[in-house]
Amino acid sequence: MYQKIKGTEDLYGDEMKYWYWIEKKAKDLAIRYGYGEIRTPIFEETKLFIRSVGQDTDIVQKEMYTFEDKGGRSITLRPEGTAPVVRAFVEDGMIAQGFPQKYFYIGPMFRYERPQSGRQRQFHQFGAEIFGSSSAIADAELIIFADRLMKEIGLVDYQIHINSLGDIEDRVKYREALKEYYAQHLENLCDDCKVRYEKNVLRLLDCKVDIEYTKNAPKITDYLGENSRKHYEELKALLDSVGIKYIENPRLVRGLDYYNRTVFEIHHQKLGAMSAIAGGGRYDGLIKEIGGKDVPALGFATGIERLILALKAENVLVDEIETNVVYIAYLGGFDVKAEAIRLSEELRREGIPVGLELMERGLSAQLKNAARVGAKFTIIVGESELERNIVLVKNMETGEQLEFERSFVVSGIKDMITEMQ
């Protein structure tokens, strides 16, 4: 028997109500905030991610799904969504459309990580990107958008963490301070951190092992230049002006190399150690880094699987998916079948979800199946009903059965559904 690849999931049944709920809320909200959708390929040239995400990041070093195609090209399944959107922005000449430009995306990403609850090797993200603005008001609106998304889907128990990574000059000074600090503890660091110390000392702040050393490390906010500090203070003031609650976290650096100035994460308080459900920030140098013009940009992404865990942790009630509000049962020959299928199409054209008997079972078995699929009403058509130009409608909750003239079936069913809501 064939089995799915480790770290992947088959999604179906009752679980899909969470996916529909999040995807619809996210897309509708993005449009309200002025974003247009963008869809990029799920694989790109490997060098795009090495250049954008960073050669020394865990994603590039350990987690990317990379292969050589039949043309000898190195190809990688996208591990995150920002780099492909930026590549499209540069390659397709989107800069000519003026600024700001705002795009959202939703789709699968791939990372070779240890599978665990809410973290799979194929996972799904909703993300949003803004191109063209260097103003703190863009950072504020992005964080407000992320906060509003959490509220729209029904979450309450989360916290927004923010920080500033400053400009290149600020980070040079900060890296020197970190190097000096961690040099005193180098022999006690975990093996990964010893490598990070040499390649990218900022990554030490991500470590979940050497937490005690991280607590006492220098804070980047103490090394911000005047422009970065002004930008950060304005961001906080703008968030305060609309009542957004946040926590300043000077250890927050994010796991990708392209960030500068604003970074933020959203953590859910009921998900334990792996509590991050969203994150993002500003990446002003990335577009130029991959061959475009010097255009400021920022964005965020949230993992849909992580959001579903959070919804379940809070016992959030989401809309049920009703695929069989009405079930059509029938007994008889071809004319009865034809009437049943005509009736099903009439109801569907009115926007009513309809299940049609496809197995040609006895009436008792059909009614059992109607109950199994959760039908609210079952329409019964037989030879006698066809001759009299009527149908029987059974309320599956109360057991009540009514006769409807054929010409009034659709309007009658619509009225009955309305009364139940």
Swiss-Prot record:
Q: What UniProt keywords apply to this chain's record, in alphabetical order?
A: Aminoacyl-tRNA synthetase, ATP-binding, Cytoplasm, Ligase, Nucleotide-binding, Protein biosynthesis
What EC number(s) has UniProt assigned to this enzyme?
6.1.1.21
> What InterPro entries does the annotation carry?
aa-tRNA-synth_II, aa-tRNA-synth_II/BPL/LPL, Anticodon-bd, Anticodon-bd_dom_sf, His-tRNA-ligase, HisRS-like_core, HisRS/HisZ, HisRS_anticodon
Q: Which GO terms describe its molecular function?
A: ATP binding; histidine-tRNA ligase activity
Catalytic activity annotation = tRNA(His) + L-histidine + ATP = L-histidyl-tRNA(His) + AMP + diphosphate + H(+)
**Signal sequence interval, chain numbering:** none
Q: Provide the top EC class.
A: ligase
Q: Which GO terms describe its biological process?
A: histidyl-tRNA aminoacylation
**Alphabetized CDD domains for the sequence:** HisRS-like_core, HisRS_anticodon
| GO cellular component terms, A-Z | cytoplasm
Record localization:
Cytoplasm
Complexes and interactors:
Homodimer.
- What protein family is recorded? Belongs to the class-II aminoacyl-tRNA synthetase family.
Supply the NCBIfam families for this chain: hisS
- Record's PANTHER family? HISTIDINE--TRNA LIGASE, MITOCHONDRIAL-RELATED (PTHR43707:SF1), HISTIDYL-TRNA SYNTHETASE (PTHR43707)
Record protein name field = Histidine--tRNA ligase
